Amino acid sequence: MAEAAAERDAREKLSLWDGRPDSMAPLTDRQTDSVLELKAAVENLPVPAELPIEDVCSLASQSLPIELTAVVPDSTEDILLKGFTSLGMEEERIETAQQFFSWFAKLQTQMDQDEGTKYRQMRDYLSGFQEQCDAILNDVNSALQHLESLQKQYLFVSNKTGTLHEACEQLLKEQSELADLAEHIQQKLSYFNELETINTKLNSPTLSVNSEGFIPMLAKLDDCITYISSHPNFKDYPVYLLKFKQCLSKALHLMKTYTVNTLQTLTNQLLKRDPSSVPNADNAFTLFYVKFRAAAPKVRTLIEQIEQRSEKIPEYQHLLNDIHQCYLDQRELLLGPSIAYTVTELTSQNNRDHCALVRSGCAFMVHVCQDEHQLYNEFFTKPTSKLDELLEKLCVSLYDVFRPLIIHVIHLETLSELCGILKNEVLEDHVQHNAEQLGAFAAGVKQMLEDVQERLVYRTHIYIQTDITGYKPAPGDLAYPDKLVMMEQIAQSLKDEQKKAPSEASFSDVRLEEGEASGLRKSGSTDSLNPRPQTTISPADLHGMWYPTVRRTLVCLSKLYRCIDRAVFQGLSQEALSACIQSLLGASESISKNKTQIDGQLFLIKHLLILREQIAPFHTEFTIKEISLDLKKTRDAAFKILNPMTVPRFFRLNSNNALIEFLLEGTPEIREHYLDSKKDVDRHLKSACEQFIQQQTRLFGEQLEEFMTKVSALKTMASQGGPKYTLSQQPWAQPAKVNDLVATAYKTIKTKLPLTLRSMALYLSNKDTEFILFKPVRNNIQQVFQKFHALLKEEFSSEDIQIIACPSMEQLNLLLSVSK
C-alpha cells in the first residue's frame, strides 16, 4: 500500500511537471513534439518474447499486430524453453510450488531488470553524451580563452595598423601635395625656362618669319609675357619681363622689316617700270592692283597674327599701325600722281560740260575707293580709319579741281543739275548702297554738294533780285489782252485746219494741245474755285504766255525744291514769291493804265491762280519765322524815368525805386513773326477778286446806288425834322428822269456785260472759275435792283412805276444768266 501511495504521489507530481496553468518543468514546443512522437512509437511495441503463450493467446486478436502472428511459436514447449533459457533454468523443472515461486521471483526480477535495462542504457548513453558535452564545453572554454586572447592581440595589431595606415595616408597626401607643388612650380618655371629657347631662336641667323616654327615661337613668347605680366610678385619679375620684352621687340622688328620691305619693293618695282611718264587710267589697274594682290598672300598670314594679338598686347597694335601707315604711304605714292593726272585729263575733256565732268570724276573716284577697299581686304582683316583718311586725301584732288569751277557757275539750271547729280545719282544711288567702302568719298561729295547748294542759294538771291524784283517788262509782256486774242486766233485757225485735214497733225497743234498739257497743270482751276477739267488748253494757260516773273519764279522754285534743304527752300520760296507778287502788282497796275482796269485785275487774278496752283505740288510749308525786337516798353520806361516827377524816387530804398522799375519794366520783348507765302498769295488773290467784284458792281449799278443814296439822305432829313417831301416831285426824281436812269443802267448791263464775260473767258478760260468769280457780281446787281424795286413801290405810284418802266427781276436774271 505504501508503494502504491508513493507511486501515485509520484505520478501526481509528474503530472504537475507539464501542467498548463503553472508547469513545474515546462516543455518547449520542440520537446512536446518529441514526446508525442515517442508516445506514438511506444503504442506499437511488440509483445515480449518471454510472455507465456496463454497470455499471448488471451490477447485480443485485433490488438496484435499483423507482424506478431508470423512469430508465434509452433508449440508451448518452445516458448517455455526459451523463457527458461533466458532465466538460466533450462535444466530445471518446476515441480513444486516453491520452485514455481522461485521461478516466478526470478522471472519478476528478470523482468524488472529487463525493464530497467533500456533506461540504464539510455542513462549510460546520455552519460556518454554528457561527458562529450563536458569535453566540448572545456574545449569551447579553451577556445574562448584563445579567442579572447586573439581578440586582444587583434585589437592591438589593428590599432597599430590603423596608426600606420593613417601615417601612410598622411605621407601619401604630403607626397601628392609636394608633387603638385613641384608640378605647379615646374609649370611656372616653364615660362621662365622658355626665355633661353626663344632667345636662341631669335638670334639664329637662319630664322625667317615665314618658317614653320616662327608663329608657334611667337605664341609661346606672347604666353610668357602675358603670364609674367600678370604675376608681378614673382622674384626677378622686372628682369625677366624686360628680357621677354626684348625678345618681343626682336620678333616685331623681324616682322616689320619683312612686311615693310615687301611693300616698298612692290612700290619700287612699279615706279621703275616707266619713271618718265605718269601711268594713265588704262593700265593703272594692272600696275597698281594686280602686283599687290599677287604679293598679298606672302604677308597676309603674318598680318593676321599681328591683328589677332593687337587688342591684347600694345606692341602689336603699334606694329599694326606702322604697317598700316607703310601700306597707305605706298598706295598714296602710287595713286596720287595717277589720280591727279586722270582728274586733269577729265577736266580738259569736259571743260565746258560741268555736269559730265562731275559724273565722270565721281564715277572714277567711286571705282578707286572700291578697288582700294578690296585691295586692303586682301592684306588685312580688320578695318582702319587711316584708309578712309587716305581716300579722303585722294578725293581732295577731285574737290580741288571741281570747287573753282563750281564757284564760277552762274546758271541756276547747271547748279540745280549738279545738285541732282551729287545728291541723287552719287549719294543715293552709289553711296547708300555701299556706305562702308564709299564713306570717305561721301565726305568729299557732301562737301561739294554743300558748295554747290551754297552757290545755288547765292545765285538764287541774285536771280530773284535781278530777274524777278528788278525785272523791267517789255511792251510785249504787258500787251494784254492783245497777245491773248492773237494766240486765240492762232489756236482757232489751227483747229480749223485740223478739221479740214484730220489725218494730219501739225507740230504747232501738238505743241498747243498736247505738249503744254502734259507738262503743266491746268491753270485757274484751283480747289477753292471748284475746278473742272477742260478738253483744250487756253492760250492764257500756255507756259509761254505766263508773265515772265511768274514763269521764272516757278522754274526757280522747281529747280530749288529737290536741291536744297527744306528750311532754306522755305526762305527762298518766301522771297521769290513775295518778289513775284510785287512784280505782278506792278504789271497789273501798268496794264490797268495802258488798257482797262478789268484787264489789269483779270491779269492779276489769272497769274495769282497760276501761282497758287503751281506751288501746290511742293509738299512743304512756305512759312518762315522772323524775329524782331520790340523796344516799346523800353522807350516808355525811358520817358518815364526822365520825368522830373520821378527824380526823387531814384534814392528810395524800396521796391518803388525808379531805377529798379526801369530795369524791370523796360526789358525789350522778342517778337516772332511767321510769314507764309501761300497765305500771302491767297490774300492777294482774295483782294484782287474783291476789287474786281466791287469794280464790276459799281460799273453796272453805280447810277442806281447813287439815286438810292440821295433818297436815303432825303429820308434822313425828313426824319430829323426837315420838310416833308414827295419823291416824284423832286426834279431829279421825276418818273421821266428815273426812267432815263433805269434805261441807262439797263443799257450799260446789256452792252458791257458781254465784254466783261468775254474778258473773263479770255483771261480765265475756265467756266467754273468764271462762274464763281461772276456770281458775287450778279448777286450784288440783283440786290441793287431788288432795293430799287422796293424803293419804287414805296415812293412812287403805280402810274409813275409804269412810266419808269424798270425791268423786272426775271428780265434782269435772264440778262445776267451765265451758263457754267
Curated annotation (Swiss-Prot):
Compositionally skewed regions (Polar residues) per UniProt: 523-535
GO biological process: endoplasmic reticulum to Golgi vesicle-mediated transport; intra-Golgi vesicle-mediated transport; intracellular protein transport; retrograde vesicle-mediated transport, Golgi to endoplasmic reticulum
Location in or out of the cell: Golgi apparatus, Golgi stack membrane
Any single GO CC term annotated in Swiss-Prot or TrEMBL for this entry: Golgi cisterna membrane
Residues with Phosphoserine modification: 655
Compositional bias of kind Basic and acidic residues: 1-21
Superkingdom of the organism of origin: Eukaryota
Stretches the record annotates as Disordered: 1-26, 496-535
UniProt membrane topology term: Peripheral membrane protein
Keyword annotations: Golgi apparatus, Membrane, Phosphoprotein, Protein transport, Transport
Quaternary structure and interacting proteins, as annotated: Component of the conserved oligomeric Golgi complex which is composed of eight different subunits and is required for normal Golgi morphology and localization. Interacts with TMEM115.
Primary role: Involved in ER-Golgi transport. Also involved in retrograde (Golgi to ER) transport.
Family: Belongs to the COG3 family.
Name of the protein described by the UniProt record: Conserved oligomeric Golgi complex subunit 3
Organism: Mus musculus (Mouse)
